[in-house]
Amino acid sequence: PGYYRVQSDTEKPFLNKVRTPHPFSMFDKARMPHQLSFNAPDDNNPTGQWAFSTVNWNLRTTGTDTSNPGPKLFENGKQSEIKALGYFRNRMWMAGEDKVFSSKLNDITNFFLDDAASITDEDPIDVTCSYNKYTEVINLTPFENNLFVNTGSDVQFTISGSDNLISPFTAEVSPSSFYSTAPLIKPILLGSQIYFFDSKRLYVYFNDKTVSMNNAVEVSYHCPDFLPEKYSTSTVVPSFDTILFNNRQNKKEVFCYTNRYSGEQVIQNAFFKYVYDRDVVAMNSYDSNIYFITTTSDESRTIHHIQKQVFQEKDFSVPLLDNSFTKFSSAVYSPADDSTQFTFDGYYNPTIDTIVVDGESLAIQSFGTGITASTVTVQGKYDTANSVYVGTKYTTKIQLSPIFYRDQGGNVIDGILSL
């Protein structure tokens, strides 16, 4: 079934399937999600290139706007904003308003039925998150065998299937917990657990398949008022069981939550934070390193930096410095004043106060910071130096939480402790 046009009268295939003549048979590419791709380096472009482009979404080739309408979110040409994306069980999932819908199985650009007269397990899924109040979906998080759906109405849903299969026949959406959450930051998946945020709080969500309603436990109970009211960007460092997130109202602050397990039990956890000398606008982790996009400003412009931080430094001979840089392009000795000038290409730091040369911390005579390089001048002859570290000193402060009584599982027990 469907609509075809003749494309050849001599070679197969003779026919080519085309979109139906009925209204709303295609998506507006400009209003749908776009794709970011990387073109590999070649002779014409030795560094490669990122490209941001539209997606060729599948057309409706069978049925009508009644028998094969596509996602309910766009029913009858309704223009609604897509608020969330996710990839789960070989399907692309999208959400807007109180609707959640998926692509066809193994075809992330197809949101129409292949045959309007016969629905199969592979066809797209379309569900509504209904409760006793309007529940607008704000993000989607794949989690174990479920899709965790967070809403702006203090209700969390899960979308699941049966017999390890999620299809138009088995998809089930049900409310699973009822907690307020921060609106501008997504829940974070760390290991086999979901963490989500609220004002000055961090929760861990426990998914128990044997119960209809699940619980979330506040893991920040022992440090009241330590976390920010509003959040911006976040990431996880899986190898160290750590979550990082920053303060939307003061982007120089990056908070961390880390825990240690014994089997399935958390035996230790802690919060701490870094305070940088510049705003953190984005961050992500790769391996055991954290990569930040930060900004600084001079009198006329905003400068963006890409910075790397080793989350746990194992070489204790490396100086601990902010904005640390090690690759110098030249070291020039001047016999006239017995000084050596180091040049660091691609390094911008207007707050340089420390340089360590071959393990020796030297006094800085002068330094300069330009658009493409920085220079540091020290007293003495060091033009044959092997290792050089330059950066800014910082202060470490340790703040302990109040004392709480805990149960055998290490959980804080609320109440009054009498000694």
Where would I find each of the regions flagged by the language model?
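Predominantly extracellular/luminal cell-surface or secreted proteins
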Residues: 5-9, 16-21, 102-108, 159, ...
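Residue-identity detector for glycine
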Residues: 2, 48, 63, 70, ...
